[in-house]
A protein has these predicted regions:
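DPxDG-like acidic metal-binding loop motif
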Residues: 1
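Histidine/acidic-residue-rich, glycine-tolerant segments that coordinate divalent metal ions
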Residues: 4-127, 132-136
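Metal-dependent amide/peptide-bond hydrolase catalytic core
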Residues: 98-277
């Protein structure tokens, strides 16, 4: 207890840790803020950090914008069911869904050529479900995916272009296609300039030449519901690089692992950033 009291007396700032639920479904930050996570007293700064395994030992901070705009989409393709022995009486939703997937792939290829200033972007599908049985023409297919873009105007243009493509597929296949966005977009956020300068000094001190200051060209097409915190106060997003040599498994891969030797260095860096505020 005495040691804890001594540390509290010597620590130069008041610190609050946020353990956020529901981050992966984009709801955590909203719920935390509704519960007063940055109030009483009001937070003067917000720090967040991730670990990544695409590079070995290091620390990375983005200059300015630090995330992308993203949203999940759901595409419903409605056809008409019939027996395959009477195929002329049905409308194949699976065939139309295949056209949708092809259109999304083509959009990724063509959009950048038509919009050279679009920046990084991607449209993708993660799941597809449809059909009842082998001898039945499917009357409904659902595709779930996402739109991601560095620039908000690019995100909006991609959404509109995809909608136009879906309307064309409707005409060609006789299906009805509806695209929905079950939730609001996750907007991009930017690192505070002063906090970024602090991170540069600390990063070089702790990690030496393994500290990386990244620009928009290196921006990852990821988003985070933490943008809501950045709207409330100045913030800094830091990535600690902890890849294991020879085991470069990407995010959300079942074999994703971190080199835990990064942990004391990341704690030291965070401590020095906090005590500099």
């Amino acid at each position: 207890m005495a040691e804890e009291q001594r540390m509290q007396e010597n620590f130069p700032v008041r610190l609050r840790f946020l353990f956020e639920p529901a981050e992966e479904i984009g709801e955590g930050a909203k719920r935390m803020l509704q519960a007063g996570a940055l109030e009483n007293p009001k937070a003067d700064a917000f720090l967040m950090f991730h670990y990544a395994a695409d590079m070995t030992f290091g620390m990375a901070v983005h200059q300015g914008q630090a995330s992308s705009m993203i949203n999940s989409m759901q595409i419903h393709v409605h056809g008409k069911s019939s027996h395959w022995c009477e195929a002329d009486k049905g409308i194949d939703a699976i065939y139309a869904a295949a056209q949708v997937i092809s259109a999304i792939h083509d959009l990724n290829e063509s959009f950048g050529k038509q919009h050279p200033d679009a920046g990084k972007y991607i449209v993708g599908t993660g799941t597809i479900h449809g059909g009842e049985y082998t001898n039945i023409i499917a009357d409904h297919v659902v595709l779930n995916g996402n739109i991601r873009a560095v620039h908000e105007e690019t995100y909006t243009a991609l959404e509109h272009e995809l909608e136009r493509n879906l309307q064309e597929i409707e005409k060609q296949t006789g299906t009805q296609i509806r695209m929905e966005f079950p939730k609001d977009p996750v907007y991009a956020f930017a690192n505070d300039e002063e906090l970024t300068e602090t991170a540069k000094v600390v990063g070089a001190e702790v990690f030496g030449d393994k500290f990386v200051l990244e620009g928009e060209d290196e921006l990852f097409l990821s988003g985070d519901n933490a943008y809501r915190y950045f709207r409330e106060t100045r913030g800094l997003f830091t990535v600690f690089l902890a890849g294991i040599p020879g085991e470069n498994h990407p995010l959300h891969h079942p074999k994703f692992q971190l080199d835990e030797r990064i942990l004391p260095y990341s704690v030291e860096a965070l401590y020095k950033i906090i005590t500099t505020l």
